[in-house]
């Protein structure tokens, strides 16, 4: 309603929309109202779900022909945005029935990983804040209080993890000044091992 009141056009990055955890549901931005449908550029890609990031297979859905023409014009200025034959067939193949079955199984695995990591962190890493994600395979740890109490910086904490083979990511580019971003897209046994290493060697 606010967007409609001020005639705002929306660019919605919905690249994670396939990866929904537990019983949660994804609501496409374009589905919430007729105004949203006609004033949203929704962007998708198979790269997160099917690990196809290198193939330049992203795409957009635009119902408004005027906005679509504007986006097509801007996109055409760089040949990098053009699909190639390999990426086109990879995209088609990903969204066949087998791809849907793969995605269902993937979400079950990721849900188990996220639930385990969330419970483990809350049980073992006092003063580390974490929220159970509803989607994606990323987990964001807020280490503000932990770092303050232990007198170390987030850079030092991140280095500790890397030093014991837990490759995690600086959370600052994701609006978390003292955060660490963890990728949980891996076998469950490795999630267990990573948490065990963090308990023994990092959050000590």
Task: Kindly label every feature range from the protein language model.
Residues 1-204:
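PLP-dependent class I/II
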């Amino acid at each position: 309603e606010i967007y409609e009141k001020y005639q705002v056009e929306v660019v919605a990055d919905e690249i994670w929309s396939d990866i929904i955890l537990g019983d949660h549901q994804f609501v496409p931005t374009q589905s919430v109202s007729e105004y949203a449908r006609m004033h949203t550029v929704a962007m998708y890609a198979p790269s997160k779900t099917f690990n196809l990031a290198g193939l330049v297979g992203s795409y957009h859905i635009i119902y408004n022909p005027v906005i679509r023409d504007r986006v097509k014009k801007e996109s055409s200025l760089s040949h990098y945005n053009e699909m190639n034959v390999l990426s086109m067939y990879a995209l088609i193949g990903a969204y066949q029935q087998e791809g849907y079955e793969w995605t269902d199984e993937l979400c079950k695995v990721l849900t188990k990983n996220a639930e385990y990591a969330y419970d483990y962190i809350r049980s073992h890493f006092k003063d580390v804040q974490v929220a159970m994600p509803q989607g994606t395979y990323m987990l964001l740890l807020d280490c503000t209080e932990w770092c303050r109490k232990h007198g170390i910086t987030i850079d030092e904490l991140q280095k500790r993890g890397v030093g014991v083979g837990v490759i995690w990511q600086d959370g600052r580019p994701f609006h978390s000044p003292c955060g660490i971003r963890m990728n949980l897209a891996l076998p469950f046994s490795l999630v267990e091992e990573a948490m065990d290493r963090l308990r023994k060697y990092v959050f000590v």
